[in-house]
Amino acid sequence: MKALLLENISGVARAVFEKAGFDVETTATALPEEKLREKIGDVSILGIRSKTHVTKTVLESAPNLLAIGAFCIGVDGVDRDACNQHGVAVFNDPHSNSRSVAEIALGEIIMLVRRVFAANSEMHGGHWNKTAAGSHEVRGLTLGIVGYGRIGSQLSDLAEAAGMRVIFSDVTDVLARGNARSYSFREVLEQADIVTLHVDGKTRNRNLFGEEEFRLMKPSSYFMNLSRGFVVDHEALARHLKEGKIVGAALDVFPDEPESSGPFSSPLQGLPNVILTPHIAGSTEEAQQNIGQFVSSRLAEYIETGNTMLSVNFPHCQLELVPGSYRLSHIHHNMPGMLLAINKVLAERSINIERQVLDTRGEIGYAIYDINRPCDEVLMRRLGDIPHTIRFRVAETPRSLQFA
């Protein structure tokens, strides 16, 4: 079996897959769709980061693909509906780089409020300008966090430790940490000295922040976005920076990001007290190693056992492997009678079901079975031919798999 790892994924992942018996190919960059279609035909596991787009067309060129690992938080570039249609499980890591993002956010808050980057630019330009004008302590300032998930809540802890008052807004009713307090979206914008966005990539957040939202912010406030590029109207932000309503900004994500190292353009370039970074908030060596270990382990476990815990598109099913039993898994459309149909095929062959679990998620149903004897070719064909079956898989030992 083959694993294809794109975008310079941590070598930790390669080691996990090689230990599991995979042939591993790696690339340092994302691949354009046509090139990816050429390479993916014999691939069982595809590893990506945020630049790769796995479309329906790509999946149609990947008959052997069993699972995709997004070695990042977001899975915006993966067509999950098409993955469901092809029986491809998708996994990501929503945790491992949260600390890295929270730390750089706090660092940028301090850099903005102290005008460090503006002073740095003057010094590199040969101008000494020792002044306290426009430079402040963060202690006592109000930080407004929009999106109080894993990253937002960790930033809340760090900011409070630095002496800041923390308020937040979230679309769900989440528990506040420390002394942080929940407010409406509008109230956060009106009260915060610094507004920072940490929202997810769902459609509801597209164009979340534009002209109207910037007008609601306090005069001489700061703005940060380390979430998704499509969340913010950068032209509107540039206008408010030039007018002095917003006195500093930090952005790590952009509406149109290059696929690899190369030219970049933004209306925010050249503006004073604006920090621009190339989508690196979560890119620390520690985070990438942890993500590499976590996602590759989830993928290897899925291939070896069929367990789908933490999949972003499949139902979450898990059965402990028991020596002496034979495991099969069945991906199907969520239709009445599927469990009965599978059990009937097994019963007709006098096969005993030792353990089973079935769950559904939207249009997808997923079942794991442990049975008392191996599947022969006739049984494999019968199970694969059950109406509404998407994919059937049987494993006689953890690393000896057959597919139908």
Q: Language-model features: where?
A:
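Short, Asp-centered acidic motifs that coordinate Mg2+ and/or phosphate
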Residues: 44-45, 67, 194, 222, ...
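Rossmann-like dinucleotide/phosphate-binding beta-alpha-beta segment
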Residues: 1, 11, 131-219, 235
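Rossmann-like dinucleotide-binding domain for NAD(H)/NADP(H)
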Residues: 90-91, 211, 215, 220-222, ...
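An N-terminal-biased, well-structured beta-alpha scaffold segment characteristic
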Residues: 1-91, 188-190, 210-216, 349, ...
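Phosphate-binding beta-alpha-beta segment of Rossmann-like dinucleotide-binding domains, i.e.
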Residues: 86-142, 154-161, 307-311
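NAD(P)-dependent dehydrogenase/reductase Rossmann-like domain
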Residues: 261, 281-404
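Short glycine-/small-residue-rich Rossmann-like dinucleotide-binding loops
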Residues: 51, 193, 198-201, 227-228, ...
